[in-house]
Amino acid sequence: MLDRREFLAVMAAMPLAGAAAIGEAHFPNRLCQFVWRNWELVNTERMAAVLGTSAGNVLRLGAAMGLPGKRTLTEDQLRRIYVTVIRQNWHLLPEGQLVQLLGWDLERLRFTLKEDDFLDHKLGPRPECEPVRWIALTAAENKAVAGMRAVVREAFGAELGRPGAELCGFVGELSDARNPLLRSGIGGAGWTLAPVADPRLARAGERFLRFVRESFGGGGTGRLTLTLQAGMAGSRTTIEAGSVRVEAGEVAELMQALYALQDRMEELESPTLPAGVTERKTVWTPRYLYSYFALYGDPLFEPEADPFPDAYLEKLARAGINGVWLQGVLNTLAPSAAFPEFGKGSETRLRNLKELVRRAGEYGVRVYLYLNEPRAMPAAFFASRPEMKGSSYQHLFSMCTSNAAVRDWVRDSLGHVFRAVPELGGVFTISMSENHTNCFSHGGAWGVKVPKAGDCPRCAKRESWDALAELFIAMRDGVRMGSATAEVIHYDWGWPDEMVGPLLAKLPSDTRIVSISEWSVPVERGGVKSAVGEYSISVVGPGPRATRNWAAASKAGMTNLAKVQFNNTWEISAVPYIPVPQLVLQHCENLRRAGVQGLMAAWTCGGYPSSNLLAAKAYYFDPAPDAAETLRRVARQKFGAGFADAVAAWDVFSRAFVEFPYGVAIYVIPVQHGPANLLRMTPTGHKPGMILFPHDGMKTWCGKYPPEVVERQFAKMAAAWRPGLALLERAVAAAPAGKRRGAAMELGIARTCYHHFWSVANQVEFYRLREAGATDRPRMRELVKSEMALARAQYPVAREWSVIGYEASNHYYYTPLDLVEKVLNCRRILEEL
């Protein structure tokens, strides 16, 4: 399987311009394509300005094609969908018009393409596009437009006019602190809070009382007492008639005990809980993940695009998460006398970081900075600093960490950050991937052999572990300048086995290691053998690589964390979570046996407060839970009376998902796009782009798998998944009103998985037949009709739930109108067949 770094290396070698744009024959002309593709992504006036016409003309053309009423997008929506806008126009507009459409300047576009999570590589080579201008349609084009409208009406009818959710509507939902009414008509005098000295505890207690009032109409009677007990490990909750007493040694532990009470009340749909005493001790900490909707750019400089609103932080905390991470770039966070060009805007960023840390702490959540440092610089940076110039990669050069002045800068910059914000939870680093950083970071056979430092005159003579140990110690010393307790965690992504032992032996024992749990687990699907080399939920960890690295960390006196994905992976990231909690809990049980001490629970995808996370939460504490009972309780909490059917559906989905043909090229296969990916009778001539453009590159999609096996496995997985949908439909129908919306969204997520899996099987078979000469045209027509049916079935799901098709670093893979376009595309293909 082509992993992330290998894919980026391949894409870096490809030309970035000069390729022919892909034409779309299902549109009468490029003007119609522009209006259609941007209808729900760009406001009318901006579209008109790009075309050189009036807003009225744009609206009339959209209506003539059968498009639904034009919406007005807010500034917040626009800042959250720019990747989708760029993608939709990559094969349509020249650079100047694309800049105008975004409302940016050319410098910002080029910076975004380069720095925004390798966006230029995801999009692929830049096509040559002629400007799109407003023109009067010919008689033939008007006739074709009328035909489009007829097809749209026939396929979607009144469904197309339903407003559904707004783009990125999930931001408002996750930012909403209100609790749904679960049950009314409960008598009682209400709940009260005993006086609390600690202000944070008092606010936590008031939030608990608000939850009871809103969830149960103010019913029930009780008095809540919150007590901090110095030296106490874990928490103790005592429930008696008319009172609840919660004791803990730390504020965060006490908050988790309160969240457990809320879970139990939601499960029982009652503010009155059975009497008893519950004692818990934390076994995994920290447990941190990324925001579901953070913008990848510079969130600390743009607080209006808040990646962690208060209500979202509370929802994550209720799901057992006690840490969140965001990227920090050292040369933007700290000034430097040695490098006066660094640190511009750092005061603003640190002020905003301090406020985020304060707000997160209100919910028992700590903030971690992801460091990929020191960032490589252009050659001009080293004109007066030749002694610092390290290995080269893609026209940039490392700030060589064998130079003591560079390490001093790293240390002092982190010291500046942690003195300014000592309450930070800590940092975690990636040192062998992503951006070019230390001289070894792109040094050859990644993850397999010991890296080399290439053309660095100093590091080329050194072992990688010696240079990295110096860098890691500088980082640790910088953190300790401001905090004695902040975590210093090193992520082993890309570390070769030979490097691990010597490196860890040189590190201080107060640093920690995080290892990808499922990495290198052997797997056989459809008769094809492979091993995990990316994130996976369908393959359950831990694997031999992680257990070796954890053992090496223990031998060096360090504690360890597991890097996991409990919500989703690139197996399918078009949904906020894959509803397979049985697999998640199997992973948790394995990790408990392995003795890990903390979790990194998500990379950029996977930050949604889901039923998967709620189920995993039971394993974060002692005593160890029972998996079956955990699933029943979470299902009752989320589905109410329909819980048994929900558990049965999850079991069906979990058993189906282990058929995923792991080892396919998950970065390019159209599992993220499903039925929105257009069919092509004629080869496009374009290689797939990472995540964003699968195109028609079927052989690339399949990786080492024969296409027939990929086709068969996706079809098998979809067929096995389908019975779970009927079970989940019953569970939703039985859910009480206060739980029905969340239950219905989970059904929409499950349907999306089914539609995407089946569509991938269709597309692989279609292109397999195309490559064989398109002689079996009856079967190809069947596949095209199946794709049309899947697009129609997915449309109301995507329209109703704004989470569908969205991922934080890629924005929307598709919008509802892309599914309507797929029907037009398929009708055109049928004409050719």
Question: Where are the regions a protein language model picked out?
Answer:
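Secretory targeting signals
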Residues: 1-2
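Feature activates predominantly on carbohydrate-active enzymes
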Residues: 120-126, 151-214, 233-432, 436-453, ...
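Short secondary-structure boundary/capping segments
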Residues: 116, 305-306, 340-343, 384-387, ...
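Alpha-helix capping and helix-loop boundary segments enriched in small/acidic/polar residues
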Residues: 73, 344-351, 397-408, 445-446, ...
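Long, charge-rich, low-complexity intrinsically disordered regions
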Residues: 21-181
